[in-house]
Design a protein with these regions (language model features):
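Short loop/turn segments immediately following beta-strands, especially the blade-tip
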Residues: 49-55, 96-109, 154-166
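Asp-box/WD-like beta-propeller blade repeats and closely related beta-sheet repeat scaffolds
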Residues: 1-13
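Short, conserved, GDST-rich strand-edge loop motifs in beta-rich repeat architectures
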Residues: 21-42, 94-97
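Short loop/turn segments immediately following the C-termini of beta-strands
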Residues: 23, 78, 87-90, 99, ...
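Residue-level recognition of a conserved intra-blade site in WD40 beta-propeller repeats
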Residues: 11, 75-77, 135
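Short coil/turn segments that connect the beta-strands within blades of beta-propeller domains
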Residues: 14-16, 80-82, 138-140
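Surface-exposed loop and turn segments in beta-propeller and other repeat-based domains
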Residues: 1-4, 57-67, 106-125, 166-198
Length: 198
């Protein structure tokens, strides 16, 4: 099983497991993102499950193209919990991973942040690009940082299978008059607004 550059990991000793993510081949991300490298499979789409005591890879979970560049991974803080979340950077999707009744591990997509159609940017669509995820200490909220869209999101994950967006704060990003980017279609917004120049 070839490695595509491990990025982050989280472990749960109670379940004798460590799970890691894979960003991509270093020769690709060191030069900057090239969509041809994505199409060629040079960026990761798996999370990797290890036996914690034996320090051995036991399972690879394929997240598919919607899971390109899985970066940050977080178990719930409860040490007996056998589930958590992983954020896939490029297409801004979050997957819930969990231990199945058979004892192996699985994952499914629970959050999908759509790209925005834009003018005045390098591409006709701008993905959110997830750069970090964080669990609240009480395991109730999951926080996401959307680098290009410029927002920080709070999801209620009391039901981890069905996260619910409960807060959003815009802190920057590329969708501002200063950058000259105009949103022409946003699947999440009903009303369009723009921040005035100051």
């Amino acid at each position: 099983m070839p490695s595509l550059g491990r990025y982050d990991y989280w472990y749960q000793p109670h379940h004798n497991v460590m799970i890691s993510t894979e960003w991509g081949h270093p020769r690709c991300f060191m030069k900057g993102l090239d969509v041809e490298d994505v199409a060629a499979g040079n960026y990761g789409t798996h999370i990797n499950v290890y036996d914690w005591q034996k320090r051995k890879l036991i399972q690879k979970i394929d997240l598919g193209m919607e899971g390109v560049m899985p970066l940050e991974i977080r178990f719930l803080h409860d040490p007996r919990s056998a589930q958590g979340f992983v954020g896939s950077a490029l297409y801004a999707n979050v997957f819930r991973f969990y231990k199945t009744g058979k004892g192996d591990w699985s994952a499914h997509k629970v959050i999908d942040i759509p790209a925005k159609k834009v003018e005045g940017w390098a591409l006709p669509e701008m993905p959110a690009v997830l750069t970090d995820i964080l669990m609240s200490m009480d395991d109730k909220y999951l926080y996401l940082s959307c680098w290009l869209h410029g927002d920080l999101r709070q999801y209620d994950v009391s039901d981890p299978k069905n996260p619910r967006l409960t807060g959003q704060l815009f802190l920057g990003g590329c969708i501002t008059k200063e950058f000259g980017v105009k949103v022409t279609e946003d699947k999440e917004l009903k009303v369009y607004w723009s921040r005035p120049l100051t």
